[in-house]
Amino acid sequence: MIGCFSMTQLRFGAKIGISELVCCFIAPFLFFIKYHEFKKDKVALYFWLLIFWVFGAILSDYINESFAAQVIRGFSVPVTIFSVSVCIYYNLRKNADGFKWLLFGIACSSVLSIFVFQRGIAGDLAAEGDISAAVESVIGYKLFWANTLMTWLTLPLFVAYLKVPRFYAVFVMAGLSVFNLLTGGRSMFLVSMFSLVLLILCGKKIETMRTVKKAFPIILVALLSLGLMAKYTYQYAVKEGWMGEAEIAKYETQSQKGTGILALLMSGRSDFFIGLIAALDKPLIGQGSQALDYKGYTGEFLAKYGTDQEILEYSRNQMQSNGMVGTIRSHSHIICYWMWHGVTALLFWLYVFYLSVSAFKNRMHYIPEWFGYFAITLPAFFWHYFFSPFGLRVNECALYCALLYLLKIENDRKRGYVSYGN
């Protein structure tokens, strides 16, 4: 049920996912009743850091005198992550094999949410009674078909990795890599290629899956090499005109300040650096939920490092808003919430990063049936962690809880009890 309604939303003044709403009611009781089990599994720290973040969010908003709407938006993030994580982890403890049904439900929800209980702007249109416009706004999103294609093509690798022919895994990830490159998705091309390399090298045998731990330094070098390959392949394809006029214009805009990796990052992911500057200005308390840019971080950064197009768009937005102050941009998991709520949020996201890196290095082989899921989702998560907003909350909480379950298995083994996996 959590998966089937993971992408559908209700409106009670604010928007909230159906699964998230149900979890918010159930989670406090589950956590209280099952806390001794969470503590025994040595995963309680994850949940305590979220509780700590909740109080940090309240304190930050109080000190920064945030508006009520901002407070609700900021407060809801750690509360939702806590609630969904408690429910998913509880169910994993009961039956880890049910994880595949959670993932299948999430995929089904991506289709269900096209037509009913839509998210975002589509949901607003549906609430006004314009159902056809709501559906059209979802399907018309530029990445809709790419995301849908990736969801359903990778689903067999998520839920039945050991039963899926190896050539299918290679074909799907190679195809997605080419698709991402041809559509200008440089970051997703890199992520898809990284997953492809993992699936080819590690295969389906437990012995080869363990090579991730042994070859971790080599994998890091390979990742850097893939990044450089993606950069130069993209540059060559654009200069040769293979990717169309729109992509040529995009590349010329982003390369105004240079063609080095840092220069391209600063022009293509300027929000990350703007948010980082704001976070460093108030690293302990934070700027408050959906912090307003009273100090002009955005304008100051763009004046120094922004492209002509970014400066033009920023000036146009300022004129259209009649000089009203906008929110501080960040477009990043860790930077956004560190900038909003200070050190309490930072500690949680650092712990999540530790969980993901340590699992990637040491634990991906514990449950061989899940290897395809981790090989595809973890590389994508590493990118999103730094350079994308926290959006599909149930999807990401599913990953965090899977990582917690691997930690449980490791701790069980240290006590001499093999609970699951190899």
What are these regions (language model features)?
Residues 158-164, 254-269, 315-317, 323, ...:
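A short, flexible low-complexity segment enriched in Lys/Arg and Gly/Pro that occurs
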